[in-house]
Amino acid sequence: MLTSGIIVLSGGLLDPNPGLIFWTTVTFLIVLFILKKFTWGPMLSALEEREKGIKNSIDRAQSAKEEAEAVLNKNRQLLAQAGADADKIIREGKEYGDKLKAEITEKAHLEASRMISSAKDEIDQEKRRALTELRTEVADLAVKGAEKIIMANLDAEKQKNIVDSMIQELSQHRN
């Protein structure tokens, strides 16, 4: 009960007391000075350091993003260039194939023409040789026939029989 009486005598906690206000203010200022002297600087430094770290992280992220975009653009350009190069290689290969095909076809036609010409020349030579041989045989047979006619001094009927037999010999000799 005694404690209740002290509270009642002093007027309560919510009543303004000038001594209490003074000492509370002095204590607050001392604590504020101590905080400012010893903790405020390191706290501000830590906050500034954190702010710089966050800003650096944002700057690095922005740089990385720009670098990634540059690499992406470069890769797109390289891909487009590779596609163009592939198209060029395909086109050149096709042109080379067409050119090679034309050359081979031309060579084949020339070779065929040469072979045909050679065969015709060979046929003509064989034909001339056969004709020469035939003329020689006909001349020989004619000479033989003339010799027989002259030697036999035969009549017209016998001469005709001799010529016919020589023609038959020639026909048989040809076959």
Swiss-Prot record:
Answer whether the UniProt record assigns the keyword Iron-sulfur to this protein: no
Q: What is its main location?
A: membrane
Which Gene3D superfamilies does its entry note? F1F0 ATP synthase subunit B, membrane domain (1.20.5.620)
Statement: the UniProt record of this protein carries the keyword Nucleotide-binding: no
Record's InterPro entries? Answer: ATP_synth_B-like_membr_sf, ATP_synth_b/b'su_bac/chlpt, ATP_synth_F0_bsu_bac, ATP_synthase_B_chain
Q: Where in or outside the cell is it found?
A: Cell inner membrane
Q: Which parts of the chain span the membrane according to its record? A: 19-35
Query: Which Pfam families does this UniProt record tie to the protein?
Result: ATP-synt_B (PF00430)
Molecular function as annotated in GO = proton-transporting ATP synthase activity, rotational mechanism; proton-transporting ATPase activity, rotational mechanism
* Membrane topology per record: Single-pass membrane protein
Q: Which UniProt keywords apply?
A: ATP synthesis, Cell inner membrane, Cell membrane, CF(0), Hydrogen ion transport, Ion transport, Membrane, Transmembrane, Transmembrane helix, Transport
One Gene Ontology cellular component term attached to this UniProt record is: proton-transporting ATP synthase complex
Function noted in UniProt: F(1)F(0) ATP synthase produces ATP from ADP in the presence of a proton or sodium gradient. F-type ATPases consist of two structural domains, F(1) containing the extramembraneous catalytic core and F(0) containing the membrane proton channel, linked together by a central stalk and a peripheral stalk. During catalysis, ATP synthesis in the catalytic domain of F(1) is coupled via a rotary mechanism of the central stalk subunits to proton translocation.
According to the record's subunit comment, the protein's assembly and interactions are:
F-type ATPases have 2 components, F(1) - the catalytic core - and F(0) - the membrane proton channel. F(1) has five subunits: alpha(3), beta(3), gamma(1), delta(1), epsilon(1). F(0) has four main subunits: a(1), b(2) and c(10-14). The alpha and beta chains form an alternating ring which encloses part of the gamma chain. F(1) is attached to F(0) by a central stalk formed by the gamma and epsilon chains, while a peripheral stalk is formed by the delta and b chains.
The UniProt family comment states: Belongs to the ATPase B chain family.
Official protein name in the record? ATP synthase subunit b
Source species = Chlorobium phaeobacteroides (strain BS1)
